[in-house]
C-alpha cells in the first residue's frame, strides 16, 4: 500500500511539474504582429501580450514612396513618448527597439512630402524577458 501511495504522489508531482514547465515555455514564445496599414500603425499590447511579463521588442517598418523626388520620415512612439525617427529617403527600412508590457501602446507614424506609398509594412516582434 505504501508503494502505491508513493507511486501516486510521484505521478501527481510529475504532472504538476510538467504543467509548470509548459506554462514557462508558453510564456517564453515570441509574438509576431504584422500590419500593412499605410502610413501608420497602432499596436495596443492589451490585444496580444500576457499580463505580468516584460517583453523586449523590435519594430521594423519597410516603406517606399513612388518617386525619388520625394522624401519620407518614420517615427515610433511608446506610450506617446517618441523613441526615434528615420527619414529623408524615398525608400526606408526603419528599426526601433525597447521594452514594454501589457497595456503599453506603440504608435508608428509617417510623413512624406509627396508621392504615394508603394510599400508600407510593419512587423513587431515581442520577446519575453521576465
Briefly describe each language-model feature range.
Residues 1-9:
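Long, low-complexity or tandemly repetitive, helically biased scaffold regions used
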Residues 12, 16-18, 22-130:
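Extracellular jelly-roll beta-sandwich "head" domains, especially the C-terminal globular C1q domain
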Amino acid at each position: 500500500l505504501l508503494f502505491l501511495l508513493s507511486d501516486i504522489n510521484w505521478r501527481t508531482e510529475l504532472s504538476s511539474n510538467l504543467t509548470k514547465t509548459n506554462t514557462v515555455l508558453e510564456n517564453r514564445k515570441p509574438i509576431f504582429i504584422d500590419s500593412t496599414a499605410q502610413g501608420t500603425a497602432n499596436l495596443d499590447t492589451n490585444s496580444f501580450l500576457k499580463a505580468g511579463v516584460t517583453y523586449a521588442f523590435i519594430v521594423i517598418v519597410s516603406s517606399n514612396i513612388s518617386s525619388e523626388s520625394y522624401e519620407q520620415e518614420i517615427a515610433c512612439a511608446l506610450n506617446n513618448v517618441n523613441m526615434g525617427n528615420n527619414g529623408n529617403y524615398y525608400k526606408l527600412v526603419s528599426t526601433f527597439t525597447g521594452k514594454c508590457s501589457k497595456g503599453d501602446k506603440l504608435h508608428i507614424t509617417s510623413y512624406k512630402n509627396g508621392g504615394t506609398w508603394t510599400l508600407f509594412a510593419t512587423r513587431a516582434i515581442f520577446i519575453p524577458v521576465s
